[in-house]
Amino acid sequence: MTGYEARLITFGTWMYSVNKEQLARAGFYAIGQEDKVQCFHCGGGLANWKPKEDPWEQHAKWYPGCKYLLEEKGHEYINNIHLTRSLEGALVQTTKKTPSLTKRISDTIFPNPMLQEAIRMGFDFKDVKKIMEERIQTSGSNYKTLEVLVADLVSAQKDTTENELNQTSLQREISPEEPLRRLQEEKLCKICMDRHIAVVFIPCGHLVTCKQCAEAVDRCPMCSAVIDFKQRVFMS
């Protein structure tokens, strides 16, 4: 699947919203399961495409460590995708705050080097900013170590996911299949899109792959951080 034409053939009579030529150029080929595609180089899988989504942008968003992506688009493109996405989310939130609170955030959070470090690891700007705000409000000071910040971010992401699942469960009368679909997607390996996630990467804390796919990588497919240790977990 290293060749563009070979990848393009796999799409056959592709009937989904994203252009198959763009998908093939971005390194993806169809795996024959609805609109699921997979990168020939990094093995990263994507599905549930929305109209007007850019395959290159989605590739950079979810698998920034892919060498094919890096060769074709470069580090600057990947960094811009993540930075633009983070700043767009932050702009809406910041404009809603009072001037005094905005100044306090700028003075205590934006100069903190751990803010950029967390973003480079794949965390969303607004999530990092929010958790730093909460830290300042409860303890009077910002984070001192990146390890503690990452641990709190991972914990917050887990709580958010559980809350979202609980909220969708209350909407079963409106859409009975939606909560189950989202739960299944949350638990799927982001590389093979087939088996359940089962390994946490240390130190970045991402839980995105099954045991088999985790054995084949030495960098986190989510944030491209070097993996020091792989911790097996068992999902209920």
From Swiss-Prot:
Classification via CDD domains: BIR (cd00022), RING-HC_BIRC4_8 (cd16714), UBA_BIRC4_8 (cd14395)
User: SUPFAM superfamilies, alphabetically?
Assistant: Inhibitor of apoptosis (IAP) repeat (SSF57924)
Q: Which GO terms describe its molecular function?
A: cysteine-type endopeptidase inhibitor activity involved in apoptotic process; ubiquitin protein ligase activity; zinc ion binding
Which coarse location class applies to the principal site listed for this UniProt protein? cytoplasm
The GO cellular component terms are: cytoplasm; nucleus
Q: Which UniProt keywords apply?
A: Apoptosis, Cytoplasm, Metal-binding, Zinc, Zinc-finger
Expression by tissue, per the entry, reads: Testis specific in normal tissues.
Q: Where are the BIR repeats?
A: 7-70
Complexes and interactors: Binds to caspase-9.
Entry's family note: Belongs to the IAP family.
Q: What does this protein do?
A: Protects against apoptosis mediated by BAX.
Protein name (database record)? Baculoviral IAP repeat-containing protein 8
Instruction: Please give the organism.
Output: Homo sapiens (Human)
